[in-house]
Amino acid sequence: MLFSKSLVALVACFLPLIVSATELKLRNAAATNVAADSYIVVYKDIDDSTFESEMFNVHSFLSKRDSTFRGLGHKYKMPKFKGYQIESDMDTVNRISQSPHVAYVDKDVKVSAYDLSVRIGAPWGLDRISHRNGTSPGLEEYTYDSSAGGGTTIYIIDTGVYIEHVEFEGRATFGANFIPGSPDTDEDGHGTHVAGIAAGANFGVASKAKIIAVRVLDANGDGKGSNVLAGMQWAADDAGKKNQTAKSVINMSLGADYSEAFNKATEAIIAKGIVVVAAAGNEDANASGVSPASTVDAITVGATDRNDSRAAFSNWGVALDVFAPGVDILSAWIGGKDANKTISGTSMACPHVAGLAAYFIGLEKNGTSTPSKIATKIKGVATKNVVLHPKNSRDNLAYNDDGY
């Protein structure tokens, strides 16, 4: 009897796959910077049992249809976001998408780190975010509460982190690696630089926060959206297992063409109680066209220079919540335990604000922090009306509320 019920369920599931396929439920059809023949199938808000049945049936169908099928890729299972990555041809994905449980399909967008030019400079950014009225020339003075993000964790979803760097004082660990065949370290430098800005001993905003590296980009700073989503889920699950959700921040100094799957996954993580901070992007374009920057409840960060002018490369628009220093930023680098480098990008602005988020969470005495409260705090205390040429963006410049 149990076998009969299973058989009926299996046949019912495959009806949409057997009939003529109708229009593919593809949301980001215009995206061009994508991984070939790779898709993310996103389901409606179904229960875990139904989702597991869907994956089993799709796997069975594809195994019979294609002898070279190697199985489904990353699986994503979070509240209000369930799906998986699949490598297959458009016709096959079209048929799979006809299941009544499938909400939509996204092309697997390519993701890149947001760094730019290299130049000798100094960590003036810390000085700026702790002073209302500009930097202190020659002083590089950072005024902050000595709690400095203690008791919080910042997940750096990036190229990895060189955790042995002296800037991290043993506070950095390597959490997970989603680049097959790569070592558990940073081969590019971008992730280490970002981590240094967020929580380095000398370069960092929250210098007592823990750092956990989640590698989703390769040695060139590139990767696939499906790997980034897997890294995001790992970070959310890790924070949950440690009962540290309310004390965790995810930094995403990376981006891709707009992807609804990307944004929905980001919203799902925020709904779990984790602050997500995203770089606006470096195309001098509307940030509403990139992900995860366009996610409504993420804290999206644009870049400014020493003169409080929006950086020429920084994306802009209503998706931005706040600006932060992002030009000529000095931080940790790879190649030696005390290596450093000065680079620019919204990738550098983003960890200033991720560090601020951890800093403000650390100041909470009763542990009632939420992503909404932290976002409101960051936008509320930001220095207003000082950013030059914000270009239809909120004129907020990040501030730690402890300087003068």
Swiss-Prot record:
So what EC number does this one have?
Answer: 3.4.21.-
Q: Name one GO cellular component term.
A: extracellular region
Gene field: SP3
Q: Where is this site: Cleavage?
A: Y114, D115
Family annotation (Pfam families): Inhibitor_I9, Peptidase_S8
The active site of this protein is located at D158 (charge relay system), H190 (charge relay system), S347 (charge relay system)
Gene Ontology biological-process annotations: proteolysis
PROSITE patterns registered for this protein in UniProt: SUBTILASE, SUBTILASE_ASP, SUBTILASE_HIS, SUBTILASE_SER
**Keyword Magnesium among record annotations:** no
User: Which positions are glycosylated?
Assistant: N133, N243, N251, N286, N307, N340, N366
Q: Which domain of life is it from?
A: Eukaryota
Q: Name one GO molecular function term.
A: serine-type endopeptidase activity
The secretion signal range is 1-20
The chain positions of domain Peptidase S8 read 123-404
Give the protein's biological function.
Secreted subtilisin-like serine endopeptidase. Mediates the degradation of collagen, the major structural protein in the mammalian host. Degrades the nonhelical regions of collagen that function in the cross-linking of the helical components. May function as virulence factor involved in epidermal wing necrosis observed in white nose syndrome (WNS) in bats.
Which UniProt key words apply to this protein? Glycoprotein, Hydrolase, Protease, Secreted, Serine protease, Signal
Where is the protein localized?
A: Secreted
Q: What class of enzyme is it?
A: hydrolase
Q: Residue ranges of the Inhibitor I9 domain? A: 38-112
The name under which this protein is listed is Subtilisin-like protease 3
Task: Give the similarity note.
Answer: Belongs to the peptidase S8 family.
InterPro entries from the UniProt entry: PCSK9_ProteinaseK-like, Peptidase_S8/S53_dom, Peptidase_S8/S53_dom_sf, Peptidase_S8_Asp-AS, Peptidase_S8_His-AS, Peptidase_S8_Ser-AS, Peptidase_S8_subtilisin-like, Peptidase_S8_subtilisin-rel
- Excised during maturation, the propeptide residues are 21-114
